[in-house]
Amino acid sequence: MDTSSLMEQILSSDNLNRAYLQVVRNKGAEGVDGVKYTELKEHLAKNGENIKEQLRARKYKPQPVRRVEIPKPDGGVRNLGVPTVTDRFVQQAIAQVLTPIYEEQFHDHSYGFRPNRCAQQAILTALETMNDGNEWIVDIDLEKFFDTVNHDKLMTIIGRTIKDGDVISIVRKYLVSGIMIDDEYEDSIVGTPQGGNLSPLLANIMLNELDKEMEKRGLNFVRYADDCIIMVGSEMSANRVMRNISRFIEEKLGLKVNMTKSKVDRPQGLKYLGFGFYFDTRAHQYKAKPHAKSVAKFKKRMKELTCRSWGVSNSYKVMKLNQLIRGWINYFKIGSMKTLCKEMDARIRCRLRMCIWKQWKTPQNRINNLIKLGVDKDTARITAYTGNRIAYVCQRRVMNFAINKERLTRCGLVSMLDSYTERCVTC
């Protein structure tokens, strides 16, 4: 494919229109200039032609990204770089033209930030490889990958495929556009900030070199962006692969392997893309399930949404719970979790009963509502005057009867187990 005249494809009306729609669809925060995505249409109407001419003449100058720190679950922070909405638009236009070119080069076992690929496919491929006898895992952690990409190495790799100097020029400008941290400018000597529309593609271009090296060595691997695992047949092989691949990453790609987090382990000790793994002795094969840390994160969010002191209606809480449940089940549907779903359904119903009980407030109101729900008068009176031991009351049989699964379902609550059974691909 001729890649010597790509800028005109990037600046074509059809490509720019698609880029605009995608940026607006993605929404996102404003960059250093304060222009919101809702103002992009008006901004392009005034400045669109000028931007195109600047790109053709290599005079377009991207603005610095705005640094945003996102806390990580295990401590520390993840640095995001928020470009201006105009730069997101230009980056998206570039990515749309470059992506089909590089898709032909990318490895089949690379799943992150690629069209029609997802984390679930990566997990299924990993399971298939494990069940072929590759039961030792080399889990390689790249230390601050997006912040440490070597610009010269990346541009050399891009230059092997892209022959349009205008495109090469603008990509490098984005890499060195700088960072604004609390109104102070800082040069971006290395890295491709997470948050830009072009960054995922650039990350895959760099790490495709790792994929090619692993393929050349005949290794079974799965990679999702910078999360990579290699599966081999013995502990000795795994340790050798860890040494050799770590050396390649650091010496050839100029990246840093975090040796404190990288490890050689069996599938049972692995956490990958939120999933854990276990050996099913009945089926005689490895299977995936939500990792304990993913479950803990779900429980924490569920508790936040059913907090009794949260001053919103119970119907709103149910709506937010449904969003959480559907999203979680949709992501983990390839895992085994029937028992977990049953337990979580029971917890959610109990938490909602506590919210409803508190909302009823007075003993007389509680008596009246329990009677309406079919509880006899004496039991309703005894239950209502139990005091403020809400957790104790809401676990009693009378409350399970009065506010049962069917009634909560009629109120709109989605069942985790039912949702999982409908979507599960391994049931």
Give residue ranges: language-model regions.
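Conserved phosphate/pyrophosphate-binding and hydrolysis machinery centered on Walker-type P-loop NTPases
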Residues: Q9, E30-K41, P83, G112, ...
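Non-catalytic, peripheral interaction segments enriched in hydrophobic/basic residues
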Residues: K317-P363, I367, I371
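Short acidic (Asp/Glu) and glycine-rich catalytic loops that position anionic groups and cofactors
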Residues: N26-D33, P73, Y102-F106, E135-W136, ...
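Conserved polymerase palm-domain catalytic core
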Residues: N47, Q54-E69, P73, D108-R117, ...
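Electropositive, glycine- and tryptophan-enriched low-complexity nucleic-acid-binding patches
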Residues: Q91-Q92, Q96-H109
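Non-catalytic, polymerase-adjacent accessory regions of viral genome-replication enzymes
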Residues: M1-A45, E49
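Extended C-terminal regions of large enzymes
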Residues: W360-C427
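A conserved non-catalytic segment of reverse transcriptases
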Residues: V176, K252-R326
